[in-house]
């Protein structure tokens, strides 16, 4: 069985922190986002920094959790700061810490290509697949089934929608607000991953 982890000190620390602060539904989403992105990279022959991508994926939504939810910053920026602090504690150099932050901030944009920023693109692909089912049909059914068995959804669609709708109300100029206004509820509700 595939584990979809990055077995480095930084990878283990990111998983530990994510498990401590995210509920099981959000934690599983983070792992699935990494897995979808890594699988996409393998299918498209994309080279990327596995540890950077994994750590960023595991903590990318911690800005949605109560301890890290900023009253002024969009959740992806708050999550980027969490990544920067976490990776500083792990001894990452300043430029790599900044990359972790950037990967998380840019994952909310769908216009970042793999050529521009491969890790940000992979996180965007992975999160879009998991949140709204975008590109899910491109993944092998056996891969998706194994992933969902190992990291079940646990009502993720409804809980995530509630989190981003809350962000949209409190921070009307953030990317989450634009996402909600653009039909997030319909896209999340139609996710084929929840129709299984």
Predicted regions and their residues:
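Divalent metal-dependent phosphate-bond-processing catalytic cores, especially two-metal-ion Mg2+/Mn2+ enzymes
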Residues: 1, 21-46, 92, 109-196
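Short alpha-helical hairpin
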Residues: 1-15
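Active-site flanking loop/helix segments enriched in acidic
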Residues: 11-29, 62-65
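Alpha-helix N-cap and coil->helix boundary residues
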Residues: 28, 48-54, 74, 95-99, ...
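His-Asp-centered metal-binding catalytic motifs of divalent-metal-dependent phosphohydrolases/nucleases
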Residues: 51-69, 79, 101-110
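Short coil/turn segments at secondary-structure boundaries
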Residues: 66-74, 91-92
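A generic, well-ordered mixed alpha/beta core segment in the N-terminal half of proteins
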Residues: 86-104
């Amino acid at each position: 069985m595939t584990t979809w982890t990055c077995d480095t000190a930084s990878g283990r620390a990111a998983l530990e922190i994510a498990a401590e602060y995210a509920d099981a539904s959000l934690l599983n989403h983070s792992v699935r986002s990494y897995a979808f992105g890594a699988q996409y990279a393998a299918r498209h022959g994309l080279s990327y920094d596995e540890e950077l991508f994994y750590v960023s994926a595991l903590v990318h939504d911690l800005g949605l959790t109560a301890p890290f939810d900023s009253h002024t910053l969009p959740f992806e920026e708050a999550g980027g700061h969490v990544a920067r602090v976490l990776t500083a504690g792990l001894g990452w150099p300043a430029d790599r810490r900044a990359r972790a932050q950037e990967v998380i901030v840019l994952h909310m944009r769908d216009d970042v290509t793999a050529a521009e920023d491969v890790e940000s693109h992979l996180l965007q692909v992975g999160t879009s697949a998991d949140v709204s089912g975008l590109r899910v049909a491109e993944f092998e059914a056996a891969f998706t089934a194994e992933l969902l068995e190992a990291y079940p959804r646990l009502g993720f669609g409804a809980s995530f929608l509630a989190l981003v709708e809350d962000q949209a109300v409190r921070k009307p100029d953030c990317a989450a607000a634009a996402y909600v206004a653009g039909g997030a509820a319909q896209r999340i509700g139609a996710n084929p991953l929840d129709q299984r």
